[in-house]
Each structure stands twice: as C-alpha cells, then as structure tokens.
C-alpha cells in the first residue's frame, strides 16, 4: 500500500508496534460484510501488532482479562468469549478474546517481561484506542 496513510512504524516507550493505523480515522463507509472504505481503499479491518517490553503483570490472568475487557470496551467492539491458558511452570499466559468484529490475542513471557498482542477489528471500531489501555495495564 505505497503512499497509504495506514502503514507506519511506531515506537513509544516500552511499546514498539508495526501497525496499519495508529490514529483515529475517518471511515467513509462500512459495508454489510463489515469491510471498511476510506477514500478509494477497502479493507477487512484494522490490524495492530504490539510488542511490549519491560512489561509487568504478565502472569496475572485476572489482570490480563481486565485489560482485554477494558480495551474491547474502549475500542467499541463486542465481546463474544475470552479464553486464557496459564502455562506452568513458567507462568506465561496465552489467550484470545473473540469479538463480533474479530479478535484480540495475547501471548506473555513474564520471565522476559515481554508480551505480544494482536488486535484485529473490522466494522466501526477503533482498535487504536485500546493501545494506551494495554500499555497502562502492563506498564
């Protein structure tokens, strides 16, 4: 997508991300199949990938679930189901929040202070608004 405003690299504090979109955006239309149109470009949704370093609370399933729920709410998405799996003995957690508009997944390595988070949302949602919620939850 050469010249597209939707692809850029961002580095902010302990969060490094490559994302299609980091700012609230104007959506020209949302089709019946939930595809977005901005200008002349149509796409399935907004995909954000977050790498959190020096993160904390990564072995706390309750904290992770709260962070997922809070980020879903602020993004304007609809939660269908959350499933978290706590690995032992390392304490890492992998989980997914299944949304009517797609998903948020998380994989944590508390022994390294690292979490990988994947947000994909279609329709009239704003996944970029979830980024500060997730940064604050694990910062």
Question: What role is predicted for each listed range?
Answer:
Residues 1-139:
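Polybasic/polar functional segments that serve as interface/processing modules
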């Amino acid at each position: 997508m050469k010249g597209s405003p939707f692809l850029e690299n961002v580095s902010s504090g302990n969060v490094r991300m490559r994302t299609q979109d980091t700012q609230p955006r104007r959506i020209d239309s949302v089709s019946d199949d939930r595809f977005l149109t901005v200008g002349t470009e149509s796409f399935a949704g907004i995909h954000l990938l977050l790498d959190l370093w020096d993160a904390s609370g990564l072995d706390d399933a309750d904290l992770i679930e709260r962070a997922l729920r809070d980020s879903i709410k602020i993004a304007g998405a609809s939660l269908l189901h959350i499933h978290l799996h706590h690995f032992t003995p390392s304490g890492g957690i992998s989980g997914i929040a299944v949304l009517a508009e797609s998903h948020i997944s998380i994989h944590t390595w508390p022994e390294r202070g690292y979490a990988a988070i994947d947000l994909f949302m279609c329709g009239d949602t704003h996944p970029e608004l979830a980024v500060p919620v997730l940064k604050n939850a694990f910062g």
